[in-house]
């Protein structure tokens, strides 16, 4: 079966590999154009583009699926298209090209967390279980019927990055299985059922910790925002990045945002009990262990995160 693969970030690479390893004829790879990366803003291929080049696959570069991209997709003559985090909408004209349509691997248990940041929103919401589904892409936002589902437990210390890494590999297997079922005529899709929730892309502000919130909510927010956009706070008006924090229910006498040593640990007060800082990146400096940073300051008396 001739397959068009569409994807851009690193989480899509395991799916591309899985389809190639399963023996599908990947006739083309659709990905977003090279983007400037790092402080020097060097134009860099997407992880999917780089992997496609290693595999010797034809690549279609498109920031959006416009007329030019549609022409290239049509020329590739795919029987089906598999899409994993491509980063753009697929218009009806493109949806109609493959005879089996487009099959999307989405990292949530639809209809929960429809949108661009399902794993991050799931962690922030405190879900105990999430997962991934393969579904038929259609005009609506993640609304199509579901072919396959897998579940994944959300650990108490999981960041969105760690959870997404696991789902990217288990989801790749699910995607290959779904395409195999389609190829053999054994696939069946069922309409989505259940409560709908939305997962819009995270903004920088989504990582801004509010120390008046309960510690549990702050911990979830920090884990959900890691690695991107990153958890952060303000200190003397400057943005300070933070790694995920640890809950410290044994300490309840710190005011929200106030810092203090507790043995060798650095604690911050919240709206409930304290949390322990793990690593911190002050403005203009590298990430470092929180106790090392605090010892460099000297006294933490009067030091307050905003």
Swiss-Prot record:
GO molecular function: methionyl-tRNA formyltransferase activity
One cellular component term from this protein's GO annotations in UniProt: cytosol
Pfam families linked to this entry: Formyl_trans_C (PF02911), Formyl_trans_N (PF00551)
Binding annotation for (6S)-5,6,7,8-tetrahydrofolate: 108-111
Sorted UniProt keywords: Protein biosynthesis, Transferase
InterPro entries: Fmt, Formyl_trans_C, Formyl_transf_N, Formyl_transf_N_sf, Formyl_transferase-like_C_sf, Met-tRNA-FMT_C, Met-tRNA-FMT_N
Gene3D superfamilies: 3.40.50.12230
EC number(s) reported in the record: 2.1.2.9
Record field: catalytic activity: L-methionyl-tRNA(fMet) + (6R)-10-formyltetrahydrofolate = N-formyl-L-methionyl-tRNA(fMet) + (6S)-5,6,7,8-tetrahydrofolate + H(+)
HAMAP family: Formyl_trans
Family membership noted in the UniProt record: Belongs to the Fmt family.
Function: Attaches a formyl group to the free amino group of methionyl-tRNA(fMet). The formyl group appears to play a dual role in the initiator identity of N-formylmethionyl-tRNA by promoting its recognition by IF2 and preventing the misappropriation of this tRNA by the elongation apparatus.
Protein name per Swiss-Prot or TrEMBL: Methionyl-tRNA formyltransferase
Organism of this sequence: Pseudarthrobacter chlorophenolicus (strain ATCC 700700 / DSM 12829 / CIP 107037 / JCM 12360 / KCTC 9906 / NCIMB 13794 / A6) (Arthrobacter chlorophenolicus)
Record lineage: Bacteria, Bacillati, Actinomycetota, Actinomycetes, Micrococcales
Gene this protein is translated from: fmt
